[in-house]
Amino acid sequence: MRKLLVDTIQGKKEETVFNLNDFPFEHLTTCDLCKKGTHRKYYNVASAFDIETTNVDGVKNAKGEYIVSPFAFMYHWQFCLDIFVIFGRTWEEFTEFFDKLSEECGAFTLCIYVHNLAFEYQFIKDFIEIENMFAKAKRRPMKFTSHKGAIEWRCSYFLSNMSLAKFCESSELCIHYKLLG
């Protein structure tokens, strides 16, 4: 765990950030449950996931053919459960974290919102077992489950039909910490 000073549009704010070894997984046991029809019970807690990625240009030979194809990779992931935030850098940390989180879920489901899930999906699909996908089109999931139903990933972009900045602007008590520019 460490404390970070974060620049926000309202000034600096101190935030606590956890790592894999000290994340308070047990917080789920304090969360209320809600039931969807006669199906599974869900944790009634806000949770969100995001990754940061970058692209690397390919290398072409004199004929214009790629000798090294362009590629993209994830260099940072972040998950928030209520007020608790964890940062990770590797896919090993990602898989270990979500395996531990799903164990803590037990027989209940944690719904995780991802803004533009279709984009994040292209990166995470190779690291978790996808189950029960509902998609708008090929490679455009609106929601899917993983970890034997313990985790349900939902696209907040499809739900809101707004950019993340606009969504935060129109949501009461929501502060968008990402600085513009």
How would you describe each model-predicted region?
Residues T8, N61, S146:
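Acidic surface patches and DE-rich sequence motifs
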Residues N21, T30-D32, Y42-S47, I51-L117:
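Conserved non-catalytic scaffold segment of RNase H-like nuclease domains
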Residues C80-G181:
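Conserved DEDDh/DEDDy metal-dependent 3′-5′ exonuclease domain
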Residues R2-K3, T54-V59, F119, S163, ...:
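Aromatic-residue detector
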Residues M1-I51:
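N-terminal accessory regions of nucleic-acid-interacting proteins
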